[in-house]
């Protein structure tokens, strides 16, 4: 046997790789674009994880709120009373800056306004064919405030209400106003405009 053939077998095998093994190579891309690509991928992954966590938290808090509401309602008669008001298309609520809240009840054709201090509540009957806009309601409210006060009468006695009438707050039944308007106005004096 030849001594030179043994030396050839003991040498390390040749390296056939195109570049160093420690570098990630994308053909036709400079180094600064590779770094930018890695940063963008990392940022997108972080954003996806954060959005996923926020959506899971929102879902959990919604389920908790629904569970608490179901436990607080509890009684079947309360559920029957609240069932018609669950339709979202019958009531619209608007916050007018810091001045107050307006509630449109399309099922009962009522519009209610409660100013921010919460000392009284204005209620206006709507016609089914002409529902007033927020601007029209605000103008009518300003006209009502500019008028001198008129004699008071009970709200809801008949269809022919007196404009500017205030209801008596002692022992009144606000069921005809509906849940949304009754909740908004509570025990405040009611003015029909």
From Swiss-Prot:
Keyword Lipoprotein: yes
Coiled coil: none
Compartments (UniProt record): Secreted, Extracellular space, Surface film
InterPro entries: BRICHOS_dom, SP-C, SP-C_palmitoylation_site, Surfactant_protein_propep
Residue positions of covalent lipid attachment, annotated as S-palmitoyl cysteine: 28-29
Keyword terms of this UniProt record: Disulfide bond, Gaseous exchange, Lipoprotein, Palmitate, Secreted, Surface film
Cystine pairings recorded for this chain: 121-185
The gene coding this protein: Sftpc
Disordered: annotated segments: 147-170
Function in brief: Pulmonary surfactant associated proteins promote alveolar stability by lowering the surface tension at the air-liquid interface in the peripheral air spaces.
An annotated GO cellular component: cytoplasm
Annotated propeptide span(s): 1-23, 59-193
The protein's name: Surfactant protein C
Domain BRICHOS: start-end pairs: 94-193
PROSITE patterns listed in its UniProt record: BRICHOS (PS50869), SURFACT_PALMITOYL (PS00341)
Primary localization: secreted
UniProt keyword Calcium present: no
């Amino acid at each position: 046997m030849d001594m030179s053939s043994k030396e050839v077998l003991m040498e390390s095998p040749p390296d056939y790789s195109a570049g160093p093994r420690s570098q990630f190579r994308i053909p036709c891309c400079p180094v600064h674009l590779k770094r930018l690509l890695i940063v963008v991928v990392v940022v997108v992954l972080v954003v996806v994880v954060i959005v996923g966590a926020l959506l899971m938290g929102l879902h959990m808090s919604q389920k908790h709120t629904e569970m608490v509401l179901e436990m607080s309602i509890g009684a079947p008669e309360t559920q029957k009373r609240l069932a018609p008001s669950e339709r979202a298309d019958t009531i619209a609520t608007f916050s007018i800056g810091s001045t107050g809240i307006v509630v449109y009840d399309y099922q009962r054709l009522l519009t209610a306004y409660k100013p921010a201090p919460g000392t009284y509540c204005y209620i206006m009957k709507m016609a089914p064919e002409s529902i007033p806009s927020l601007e029209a309601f605000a103008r009518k409210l300003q006209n009502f405030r500019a008028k001198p006060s008129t004699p008071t009468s009970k709200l809801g006695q008949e269809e022919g209400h007196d404009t500017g009438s205030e209801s008596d707050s002692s022992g009144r039944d606000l069921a005809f106003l509906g849940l949304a308007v009754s909740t908004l106005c509570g025990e405040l004096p009611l003015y029909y405009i």
